[in-house]
Amino acid sequence: MAKIYVDSKIYNVNESDNLLQACLSVGINIPYFCWHPLLGSLGACRQCAVTQYDNFQDRKGRLIMSCMTPVTDGAIISIKSTESEVFRSAIVELLLTNHPHDCPVCEEGGHCHLQDMTVMVKHSMRNYRFKKRTHKNQYLGPFIKHEMNRCIACYRCVRYYNEYADGVDFGVYGSNNNVYFGRIEDGVLESEHSGNLIELCPTGVFTDKTHSKKYNRKWDMQYAPGICHNCSVGCNISIGERYGEIRRIENRYHENINHYLICDLGRFGYSHTNLNTRPKKPTYVNKYNDLNVLNFNEAIKIGVDFFKRYKRVIGVGSARSSIENNFALQELVGKENFSNGMSNKEKECIKSILEFLKNNYIYIPSLKEIESYDVILVLGEDLTQTSSRVALAVRQAVKKKVQDIKNLYGIPKWNTSSNIHISEKFKNSLYIMHTHESKLDDISEWSYFASIDKQVNLASSIAYEIDKSSPKVSNLDSELKEKVLLISDRLISSKKTLIISGSHSFSDSIIKASINIAKAIKFRAPDHHVGVTLLTSSVNSLGAELLGGMSIESALDDLKKEKADAVIFMEYDLYRSVSEYDCEYFFKNKDNIITLDHQYTQTFKKSMLSLPSTNFTESSGTVINFEGRAQRFFQVYDPNFYDKSNCLCDSWKWLHTIKSKINNTEICWFNLDDVINSYAEKYSIFKQIKTNELNSNLRIHGQKISRSPIRSSGRTSLRSNIDVHEPCQPKDINTMFAFSMEGYNQPNSSVSNIPFAWFPGWNSPQAWNKFQVEVGRNLISGDSGIHIFKKYEKKTDVYSNIVLKNSIKEKYWNIIPYYHLFGNEELTQYSSIIQENTPLEYALIGLSDAIKMGLKKDSIVEFNCLKKDYCLPVQVSKYLTEKQIGLPIGRKGFPLALVGEKIEFL
């Protein structure tokens, strides 16, 4: 720590910071534009000027840029000196000479950093009376609106997009006072993280186009801390609502997960929550096939009669639903009748992952920690498409060597102006094994393209080369043997090694082979730091599997063999998992089927009793991410408040009410805390989830935490078009939040789940500075989430039961999955804007096969699989090996059951 003097006051600050960051960390406001905690310092805007003095006798001092000045012990500076105040005000005035006077119609108004800084420097009168420079705006795609005339040339956008995210289709053009930030020509931004430009831009150059369609100011929305449900990373998000619709999703700071960035799917893929076609009332199909709309009590009565009529009812849960909902279903049908909805293949993968996490003497890094590794090996995962935020972290890890070089020469971490020159020459090692090309190949030192079986063989060879107790592989060619020696040497000689794999290939063997490599490194060098990241396909795959249960194949088999009489699906679409033929056969009789869901899935439409449930924005619950971190998401609004005819309930409420009526007992789950207490008592692994911080009884100074900013307006007229009498605001009995602007909303050590970032004078996302102990580091309250797996010190043996297959010429075509960020995740497929931007379905075929068959791009291929005919255009891959065909697994018509199936004729 260093001691500095600021306007005659003494502060102890972090000596590794620059003066700007140090002052912000101790609560001193200095205006800035080009600096950002994520991007470091550039010194481009000259806005953060302060006066520095040589000693206490110096009365004149000199102007310095605080973002480019390192902290030195005993430094004497003034922020309030007349010279620095006049200078900062003049800089804002200069920046505004070409800035339009359009705050009232700008989407950034109300959470604009430029507005905040203008107020901070007390600039209120413009002296510029001449014509303003104007630019033509570009079309940047359906998600981001471009308004170049608002630009102040802070360079944040190009530094993030090109230097941080490695984007290549965005840049800066021009010179002097006439620069342009955009693409060479109109077009959709290619980066999967382009949406972060919206929050990083301090003005309104880049704004959320999806929000603009139904716009509200920041202070007029109701927020709740949420968890992104689109993959297993579990990024923290802030969800904004108005008039019963989700209007905007923003990044919610979490130091060890997403910090300042989320992917575009998490930011823009929410419109399925607003669909008017969503089920909102219970329905019942009688014996005459008539559809009847029910009220709550009628639906419960039919549900109770259903369970009394059938002896054994199978309950099928879902990995896209919370632990609470799955547990409620398990309690209703019994543990022996419960299925978590996973296929046999996926279940084996998740079991292996859980076994490893429970015995994790090998380190499990957080998303942020992935950025610190110097050698990374990725096996069987297309990270950019399946876990995009992990791919961005891997990109930072490859560039981490730049910081090592800077440390060698004493260049501070925050001084990023030299990064681009160093990074071209020095990079860390990334090795990838996959079936076909991925978007990380551009930074990979070596990519190996082969079938899953061959990937397992190569991974096992690496493990054997490191430690001879691993399974031995024979028949590797000489070129691959050289690569095995190279990679094994790099893995063992690095400072920190990371192995990444997961369940998206539906191969248990690739997961075990990945773990074997990590174990082999630990056996050979016990003090070597090695980490393992194992990704799953859904937000709560680990949570669902911890509850146990049979596979979906076993459940359907029991129903076909009449070992069970009926089934209840909870937020689960059978058509996504099982072949269409099997589904149609199964749904011939709908009398024995109940479905709960918040989307009109094909399964929901074919049920006897259909119960509408709340989605992740309308309910609260717990999910577990890939590292075993249990995280709570919170209800944003009450959907029944805006439309009293709605009959939407949390799935656990439907299920528990039915169970209570069947057993003629009193309802004992009155709120979410009661459900958590029940499963924490039954499953010891969940005991840590029961924490006082998340208890619904938590109060700060006697107040609940407000979901809305204090300036929220129009509450009394929200429903005036329906009824002029203002109804009572809904009461949230499940959480510590209030559906109101009345309550506590300031930084506090008791609350790590923050609905929105706001602080007096700080309305933009830069307000997160005020919620952190030190700017860019941990929150005052600490990170949210609880690691449920304890550190395990005892070493375990390598997997010796991996099936190693020799290379043989394939007779049939083998189906493998390919993924796209937009289109493969289940719920976002219902989102209209995601549908518009989903690539068309195609069959991916290797170049050698295409040449043999005389196929080229967009040629049509036909085949039959799982008793269904397919007709698809062809896309040709340079690297896909012979007799492999890639299909868009997870999309409508392409169930998970297709993976690994064989096609005889193509």
Curated annotation (Swiss-Prot):
DNA repair among keywords: no
GO molecular function: 2 iron, 2 sulfur cluster binding; 4 iron, 4 sulfur cluster binding; metal ion binding; NADH dehydrogenase (ubiquinone) activity; quinone binding
A cellular-component GO term for this protein: membrane
Span of domain 4Fe-4S His(Cys)3-ligated-type: 83-122
PROSITE patterns to which the protein is assigned, alphabetical: 2FE2S_FER_2, 4FE4S_HC3, 4FE4S_MOW_BIS_MGD, COMPLEX1_75K_1, COMPLEX1_75K_2, COMPLEX1_75K_3
Residue span(s) of domain 2Fe-2S ferredoxin-type: 2-83
Cofactor: [2Fe-2S] cluster; [4Fe-4S] cluster
SMART domains xrefs: Molybdop_Fe4S4, NADH-G_4Fe-4S_3
EC number per UniProt: 7.1.1.-
Free-text comment on the cofactor: Binds 1 [2Fe-2S] cluster per subunit.
Domain of life of the source: Bacteria
Binding-site residues, [2Fe-2S] cluster: 34, 45, 48, 67
Catalysed reaction, written as an equation: a quinone + NADH + 5 H(+)(in) = a quinol + NAD(+) + 4 H(+)(out)
Binding locations of [4Fe-4S] cluster 3: 228, 231, 235, 263
One GO biological process term: ATP synthesis coupled electron transport
Keyword presence, Iron-sulfur: yes
All copies of domain 4Fe-4S Mo/W bis-MGD-type, residue ranges: 221-277
PANTHER family: NADH-QUINONE OXIDOREDUCTASE SUBUNIT G (PTHR43105:SF10), RESPIRATORY NITRATE REDUCTASE (PTHR43105)
Name of the featured protein: NADH-quinone oxidoreductase subunit G
Upper lineage: Bacteria, Pseudomonadati, Pseudomonadota, Gammaproteobacteria, Enterobacterales
